[in-house]
């Protein structure tokens, strides 16, 4: 974990002088628990969670240092299962109006860097410039690396390879190695699966999306809702993380940031009902309760009356 950004972590010391940090996300803790507590269990593993996480924020930026995250992790299945996680993410996004799920793949950038044989420092500098879309500085830096015109052209166009799913076809023109085309082939296969499932609405592509955490190894995605100034959902594939805890398993997942949603989205409270019934009509009452649960929560309450009746409560 030596490459993980630590400046956004809250750090303190224990009684033995060891440095401890408050968790900044839940992916690492879940990976550790899966690799250790479930080491004798057979994958795949499917986890869900809700927890508070903590990040040091820039002063006066208007962002909370403590936020509530909830999410899912699918551990033990390879990239062919990405579509399962993406469909879950889209089901979350469908609860809001005017949403967008933006999909990228860090392998597209990583494969290019591997072919060019860039150092870790050079990769990090390039990623930072591409992420910020600092085109002038990016061109100056690429020129300093003395790369071929075709490779420079690839990195200069990378920040702009974004839009609807047709951008994947356009991206082939900038591929200078077969490994880059293989990444695009994999993404097109995933997009085709989403289309067959009827889940392609409001999906966009951003091949210039560069992950900030070093454990992402494949597909990455973020969800946006109109009126919220930040992504409310983010996730991706992290096939190398569990290996650090002694068990080599692929994984993919995402988390949902609840706090910005609470601030910007009206929450529709579900109705509450009490259904009174005589013991002789318990089955009929249960059937009626199942229908009512589509509108809200239902409490079944035995009654001395001979008829079933429903009362809505505040």
Please provide the spans of the model-predicted regions.
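Cap/lid and interdomain-hinge subdomains that line or gate substrate/regulatory clefts
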Residues: 74, 78, 82, 99-102, ...
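Positively charged, Gly/Ser-enriched RNA/tRNA-binding surfaces
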Residues: 25-40, 47-96, 143-314
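Short, conserved phosphate-binding/catalytic loop or strand-edge motifs used
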Residues: 66-70, 103-111
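Short, conserved beta-strand segments within well-ordered enzyme catalytic domains
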Residues: 9-13, 20-23, 46-49, 73, ...
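TRNA-binding/sensing appendages of the translation machinery
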Residues: 1-28, 36, 87, 94
């Amino acid at each position: 974990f030596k490459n993980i950004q630590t400046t956004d972590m809250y750090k303190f010391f224990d009684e033995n002088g060891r440095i401890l940090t408050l968790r900044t996300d839940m992916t690492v803790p879940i990976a550790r628990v899966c690799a250790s507590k479930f080491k004798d269990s057979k994958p795949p593993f499917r986890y869900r969670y809700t927890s508070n996480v903590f990040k040091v924020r820039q002063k006066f930026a208007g962002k909370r240092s403590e936020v509530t995250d909830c999410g899912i992790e699918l551990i033990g299945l390879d990239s062919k299962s990405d579509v399962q996680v993406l469909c879950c993410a889209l089901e979350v996004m469908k609860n809001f109006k005017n949403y967008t799920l933006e999909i990228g793949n860090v392998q597209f950038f990583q494969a290019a860097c591997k072919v060019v044989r860039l150092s870790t420092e050079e990769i990090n500098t390039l990623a930072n410039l591409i992420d910020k879309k600092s085109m002038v500085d990016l061109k100056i830096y690429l020129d300093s690396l003395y790369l071929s015109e075709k490779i420079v052209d690839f990195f200069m166009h990378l920040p702009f390879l974004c839009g609807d799913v047709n951008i994947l076809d356009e991206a082939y023109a900038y591929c200078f190695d077969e490994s880059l085309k293989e990444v695009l082939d994999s993404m097109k296969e995933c997009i085709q699966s989403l289309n067959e499932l009827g889940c392609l609405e409001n999906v966009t592509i951003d091949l210039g999306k560069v992950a900030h955490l070093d454990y992402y190894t494949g597909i990455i995605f973020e969800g946006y809702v109109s009126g919220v100034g930040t992504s409310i959902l983010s996730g991706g594939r992290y096939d190398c993380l569990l290996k650090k805890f002694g068990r080599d398993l692929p994984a993919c997942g995402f988390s949902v940031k609840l706090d910005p949603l609470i601030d910007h989205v009206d929450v529709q409270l579900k109705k509450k009902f009490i259904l009174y019934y005589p013991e002789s009509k318990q089955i009929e009452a249960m059937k009626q309760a199942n229908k009512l649960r589509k509108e809200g929560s239902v409490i079944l309450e035995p009654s001395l009356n001979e008829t079933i009746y429903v009362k809505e409560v505040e």
